[in-house]
């Protein structure tokens, strides 16, 4: 069919309505002043949004770099009940929703495992792919590739299983707080170890054996719980502020569109 386009001659006969020049200048003056104010407000909101996120990130990094007395470094495998990788092939999916969901690397982001967009499989495939272990609420999942180093905690009781390039950590509650593990894997310390262990000249990935040998800095369980409480509280406040600034940015953009609409409908 080709690309539809409007003949250049057609533009010449389009009729537009516009006010006298003094009125145009008045409207332009109003819009320029308003848009300058909106641009300043948006810049401030975006800066505040960045600062809110940076505050949490800064505190998270300080926790794992300015460690107090009693902290030790141990192999992550020694603090977990299990470390489980995926079956080494892609599960055959179906084109309809089922009760059996495959977690992909794209589902793991920013401390969360998002199950809103997943691939589905049959019950039989699910049973085969979970024959070694069924994922459960509280498992911490790490992407080994595409991209490498994203971390999220599973907070669902849905029937899920690991897709390719994922590994899950199940904390031993006698030694390790699961949320402390989540935060530790997001820290610069562990992320640096993951990058150092990366292999592959084109696509960076971490081998399964290396995922078990990460060196985890851990204090006592009591201090882990106190650290988690502080980080959870700060994260919650950061998310509240981020939501506030995002709503403000959306409102400013809506105001800009509203002003343009009013200007070209003779309402200014």
Placement of each model-derived feature along the sequence:
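Low-complexity, Lys/Gly-biased intrinsically disordered segments
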Residues: 72-113, 128-130
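Residue-level "contact hotspot" at macromolecular interaction interfaces
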Residues: 131-134, 159
């Amino acid at each position: 069919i080709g690309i539809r386009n409007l003949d250049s001659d057609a533009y010449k006969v389009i009729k537009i309505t516009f006010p006298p020049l003094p009125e145009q200048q008045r409207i332009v003056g109003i819009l320029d002043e308003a848009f300058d104010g909106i641009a300043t407000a948006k810049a401030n909101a975006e800066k505040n949004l960045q600062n809110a996120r940076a505050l949490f990130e800064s505190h998270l990094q300080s926790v794992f770099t300015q460690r107090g007395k009693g902290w030790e470094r141990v192999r992550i495998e020694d603090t977990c009940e299990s470390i489980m990788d995926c079956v080494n092939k892609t599960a055959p999916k179906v084109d309809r929703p089922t009760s059996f969901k495959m977690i992909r690397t794209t589902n793991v982001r920013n401390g969360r495992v998002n199950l809103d967009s997943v691939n589905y499989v049959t019950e039989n495939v699910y049973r085969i792919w979970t024959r070694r272990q069924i994922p459960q609420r509280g498992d911490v999942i790490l992407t080994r590739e595409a991209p490498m180093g994203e971390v999220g905690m599973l907070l669902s009781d849905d029937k899920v299983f690991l897709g390719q390039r994922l590994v899950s950590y199940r904390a031993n509650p006698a030694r390790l707080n699961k949320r402390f593990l989540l935060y530790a894997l997001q820290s610069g310390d562990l992320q640096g170890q993951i990058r150092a262990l990366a292999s592959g000249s084109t696509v960076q990935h971490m081998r399964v054996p290396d995922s078990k040998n990460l060196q985890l800095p851990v204090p006592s369980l009591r201090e882990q719980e106190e650290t988690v409480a502080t980080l959870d509280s700060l994260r919650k406040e950061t998310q509240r502020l981020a939501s506030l600034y995002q709503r403000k940015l959306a409102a400013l953009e809506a105001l800009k569109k509203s002003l343009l609409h009013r200007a070209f409908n003779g309402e200014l």
